[in-house]
Amino acid sequence: MKKTTNFLITGILGMSVLLGACSKNNSENPGPVDPVKPVRSKYVFVYTGKGEAAATYIVSTDDITKGGVSSVNNGVEVDAWSFIVQNNTVFAQAYNEQGLVRPFRLNEQGKVVEAGRSVTTFRTGVSGKVGKDFWIGGGDPRSSGIGELYRFDAVNLQISGRSTTDLNKITGTGFNAVWTGLFEVGNKIYLPYYKFKHTPGGRVYEGEYGSLDSTWVAVFSYPELKYEKTIGDDRTGFIGDWSSQQGMHQIENGDTYAWSTAMGDGEHRKSAKPSGIVRIKKGAEQFDKSYFFNIEGATGSKISRGEYIGNGKFLMAVYTNAGATGGKIKMIIADVFNNKVTPVTGVPVHEFGGFKLIVYAEQDGKTINYVMQDDAGEYYVYIINADSGTATRGVHIEGADGVTAISKLNY
């Protein structure tokens, strides 16, 4: 098998998670939202400005349908590359050996402020929310084959559990299991993975991929974070990509859907299987062999990324050229209840810009706000209606060279 270089190295700083000990308390901590007071909310963005000396900011705005938002007299500067929102808090995560996590909320005036002590941890490659009060992070196992997980208490701002797993033993093939995402499914944690053998002495991303024509998911207990078993399928490729934090979602009826780009290693070797969506029925802990939604067959091209909207509908980016594994993308709505694809009108064809789609799904089950960069290098929010497949352009994120996250916080 040929040795390949992980094509995602350029974004390795993109999606990291952290945890650990302690740092400082902040007197501006706004605390949880008082349930007696009227609930107000603002949208928050994380973006990096343009220029060599540009910083990264968390900024807020009341309205994403028009106008512009920037860091001018707005928001806070952060030294982080990835972010997870839990318990009405934005956790800013640094991608380094110490891996500092800093919490941010909106205060009573609706301003973004640091909301408590910082927490140190290790370099993290996957993360995911569990319930309303916890999130889990996992380390980078590509060279070591050692999978470290931690459970982060988003209320008390502390680590509440850890585990270590030998990921080489999971595959039983001599290849390491490199997890590509972390998802809550029922009372378990599902971690999709691909098989990878690191080149001794090489960089962390240099090595040899295993089969590109199969799907694997490691099932872990919760809250113990102990490996239990692997479930697999052979109708598409592996789920997710390194540090993309997408590829699987449990929907309202308890069924879980997972999608594969089936793009191979992104450089030399391609998957022989189509890009599509598979299903795990509620409580089954195995793939449903009666269900396969062939997205590549329906659109003529492979999935790039996807995110759940609601009511069985997913927003998906697919490449514009058949067989492509990079470049221009267009947006579709994938209805997994009816195996139907609806093109999204109003969002221009554009370059795929990173590890995941930058989105925030509203609670109405049909609206998703998507951040994209246009051909002029400017970032806008597009407000997409999943029922009609239409989109309108909204707020301009001014001065942005990259946007990492969009969410909504109450205050």
Segments and roles (model prediction):
Residues 55-159:
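Post-signal peptide N-terminal segment of secreted/secretory-pathway proteins
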Residues 38-45, 88-91, 133-135, 187-191, ...:
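Entry beta-strands of beta-propeller and related beta-repeat scaffolds
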Residues 59-61, 105, 146-157, 204-225, ...:
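Beta-propeller blade signature
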Residues 75-87, 118-132, 170-182, 238-248, ...:
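Repeated scaffold domains used in trafficking and secretory/extracellular systems
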Residues 137-146, 190-214, 257-274, 317-327, ...:
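Short, conserved, GDST-rich strand-edge loop motifs in beta-rich repeat architectures
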Residues 66-78, 111-121, 158-174, 226-235, ...:
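Beta-propeller fold detector
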Residues 1-44:
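Bacterial Sec-dependent N-terminal signal peptides
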